[in-house]
Amino acid sequence: MVMWWPCSHREPGDNGLTTERYARQLLHWGEENQQRISQATVLIAGVGGLGAMVSQLLVRAGVGRLYLVDDGIIDWPDLNRQVLYGEKDIGCGKLQLASERLCAINSATEIFLIEGRIDEDFVMPTDLNAVADCLDNYQSRFLLDELTPQGVFFVHGGLHGDHGQVLTLQSGKSQPLANIFAGACQPKGDIPVTPDNVVIVAGLMVNELFATLFGEPKLLNRCLVISLIDFHISFLDV
């Protein structure tokens, strides 16, 4: 099911670019790249730990349109890392709350809600510039990558305890995610996650999403792996 959450207050012809609001980032990447962000459409699969932070950062930066995909309910263990939710939200659906809070941050972003899982029946939007893989299981990740439209950038993020990884693929020009992580096994039980690692990996994902929108991906077919144990960073070509 796809729903449009009508939080956008843009006037016709307004691209959401306001010098005052985006003044600090305009000093860094300029108006041309800000225009690219304001005209971009990004799908975020999963609005839990990574997805909540990735979506918030994109909205704050002025992204034009977001598709949010999830079907989860907020529970107590979510609150250590899922920044869009609080104690009063326990038992509520993530998707609706995420859209309301993101709209409160930036009403110029159009938000479309897709309530459901990434499965064989999932229908991928066709107007995408990038996909952010913020899921928590490999089978759904593999399918999401498989469904990504030709030429669209796919930014994968994952974490486990003190470790995190970010990788960019381009549909039709990269090998499938399923081939890269062919030997990966889904951990049994709950995955250890700390809030600091979520913020770091989400920040790296958003940095790479910006790079793809600017036409200069830094991690295309290249996996960045970070360890917070000793702040070691390595790169693996895939």
Name each model feature, range by range.
Residues L68-I105:
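Glycine-rich phosphate-binding loop and adjoining beta1-alpha1-beta2 segment
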Residues V2-G13, I118-V238:
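Glycine-rich phosphate/adenylate-binding loop
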Residues G91-L128, C134-Y138:
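A structured beta-alpha segment of the ubiquitous adenosine-cofactor-binding alpha/beta core
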Residues I44-V47, L68:
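Hydrophobic Val/Ile/Leu positions in short beta-strands of Rossmann-like dinucleotide-binding domains
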Residues R60-R65:
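Conserved S-adenosyl-L-methionine
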Residues M1-L43, L177-N179:
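N-terminal charged helix/coil linker that caps or initiates catalytic domains
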Residues L50:
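Hydrophobic/small residue at the entry helix of a nucleotide-binding pocket
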